[in-house]
C-alpha cells in the first residue's frame, strides 16, 4: 500500500525536506483528493514518477503552493468537482497556479478493487501530467463559474429546494386525509380549502394538520418572493410558451452560451444525446447519456412540453406532433423519445438565438 507522509505545517522557504526545497523541477503537477478535514496531494516534477502522497490541512495547502510559485516553479493542480464548490480553484488561480476542476469519474483504472485517497490522488496527478503534455482527452475539465454566476444560480436552486419541501409536506397532509377517508384537495392548507375542510374534519385530525399549515404558509411566501425575483431578471419580449422563470433558470445554469463551439457540445452538455453500442457492422443506439447538467435537462424537457401547447408550429414539435399531440394516449416510450428529441433540438436553437446566429422568428418561434 502506498505510504502517506503527513505534512502538518507550512515551513518557511528555508525549510528542510517536505517543503518547496524538495522540488528541483521547473513544472510541478499536483493531484488532489479533497476531504473536509484534509487534502491528500500527490506531486510530480516534470516527467518524473509521482512522489508519495501527503496530507495537508485545508488552511495549509494554498500557502504551500504559494511557496512553490515563489521559487519559480510552474504549478498545475487538478481535483474532482465535489460538494466543497469552486472556492479552492479560485484561490489557487489567484495565487498564480493553473487549476483544473474535472468531472468525477472512477479512478481505479486497473479495476483492482482497491480505493484509497493516496491512490486516487496519484491517478489524478498522472492524468494531469498527460493533459499538460497535450493529451486533452485525459481530463474532462469543467468550466468554473464566476462568483457572480454562482450567486445567481443559488436563487433558483434555493427556490427549487423550497418547492420540494412544500411538495413533501403537502403530500404528507393529503396522505393523512386519505388514510382516514377524507377528501384531500391539492392545496388543502390554503385559506379557502382549509375553511371547507375544517368544518367536516374531526377535531383531532385538524390538530394534526395544523402542525403543517404554518410551515406551508411560510414556504408559499418564500417561494412567491423568489419567483418574483427571478421573473424580474427575465429578458423582455420572450416567445409565447417560453416563461420568464424557465428562461432565467436555463440562462443561469448555462452561464455563458458563448463557451459552446458547436451544436454537439450543446447537446452533450444537456445529457440528452443517445448512448450507443457499436461493434463491427452493428450499431445499437441506447438511452440518453444523462451526462451533464441535470437541472438544465429538467428545464429543457419542461419547456419542450409547453411548446407542444403554445408553439405547435415550432419545427421540432411539428415533426413529432402526431405522437406528442396524443398526450397520455401515446405509449410511454414513444412520448419520451419524442419529447427528448424536441428538448435536444431546443437547446441547440436557444444557443443559436442567444449567441446571435439567428433570430427567434427564423428558428420557428412565434411571438
Give the positions of each predicted feature.
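Short alpha-helix plus adjacent loop in nuclease-associated cores
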Residues: 100-141, 282-291
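Glycine-rich, often acidic, oxyanion-interacting loops/wings at catalytic, nucleic-acid
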Residues: 154-236
Amino acid at each position: 500500500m502506498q505510504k502517506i507522509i503527513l505534512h502538518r505545517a507550512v515551513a518557511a522557504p528555508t525549510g528542510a525536506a517536505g517543503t518547496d526545497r524538495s522540488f528541483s523541477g521547473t513544472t510541478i503537477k499536483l493531484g488532489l483528493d479533497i476531504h473536509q478535514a484534509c487534502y491528500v496531494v500527490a506531486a510530480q516534477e516534470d516527467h518524473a514518477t509521482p512522489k508519495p502522497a501527503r496530507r495537508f490541512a485545508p488552511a495549509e495547502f494554498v500557502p504551500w503552493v504559494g511557496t512553490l510559485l515563489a521559487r519559480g516553479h510552474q504549478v498545475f493542480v487538478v481535483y474532482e468537482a465535489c460538494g466543497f464548490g469552486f472556492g479552492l480553484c479560485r484561490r489557487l488561480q489567484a495565487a498564480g497556479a493553473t487549476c483544473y476542476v474535472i468531472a468525477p469519474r472512477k479512478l481505479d483504472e486497473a479495476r483492482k478493487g482497491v480505493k484509497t485517497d493516496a491512490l486516487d490522488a496519484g491517478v489524478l496527478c498522472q492524468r494531469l501530467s498527460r493533459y499538460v503534455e497535450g493529451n486533452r482527452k485525459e481530463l474532462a475539465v469543467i468550466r468554473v463559474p464566476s462568483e457572480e454566476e454562482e450567486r445567481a444560480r443559488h436563487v433558483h436552486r434555493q427556490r427549487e429546494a423550497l418547492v420540494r419541501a412544500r411538495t413533501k409536506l403537502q403530500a404528507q397532509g393529503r396522505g393523512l386525509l386519505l388514510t382516514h377517508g377524507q377528501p384531500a384537495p391539492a392545496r388543502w392548507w390554503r385559506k379557502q380549502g382549509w375553511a371547507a375542510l375544517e368544518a367536516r374534519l374531526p377535531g383531532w385530525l385538524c390538530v394534526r394538520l395544523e402542525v403543517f399549515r404554518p410551515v406551508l404558509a411560510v414556504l408559499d411566501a418564500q417561494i412567491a418572493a423568489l419567483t418574483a425575483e427571478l421573473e424580474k431578471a427575465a429578458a423582455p419580449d420572450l416567445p409565447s410558451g417560453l416563461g420568464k422563470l424557465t428562461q432565467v433558470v436555463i440562462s443561469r445554469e448555462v452561464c455563458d452560451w458563448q463557451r459552446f463551439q458547436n451544436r454537439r457540445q450543446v447537446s452533450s452538455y444537456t445529457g440528452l444525446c443517445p448512448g450507443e453500442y457499436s461493434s463491427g457492422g452493428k450499431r445499437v443506439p441506447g438511452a440518453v447519456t444523462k451526462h451533464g447538467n441535470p437541472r438544465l435537462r429538467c428545464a429543457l424537457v419542461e419547456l419542450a412540453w409547453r411548446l407542444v401547447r403554445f408553439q405547435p408550429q415550432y419545427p421540432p414539435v411539428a415533426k413529432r406532433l402526431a405522437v406528442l399531440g396524443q398526450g397520455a394516449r401515446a405509449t410511454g416510450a414513444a412520448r419520451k423519445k419524442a419529447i427528448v428529441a424536441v428538448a435536444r433540438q431546443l437547446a441547440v436553437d436557444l444557443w443559436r438565438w442567444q449567441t446571435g446566429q439567428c433570430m427567434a422568428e427564423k428558428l420557428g418561434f412565434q411571438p
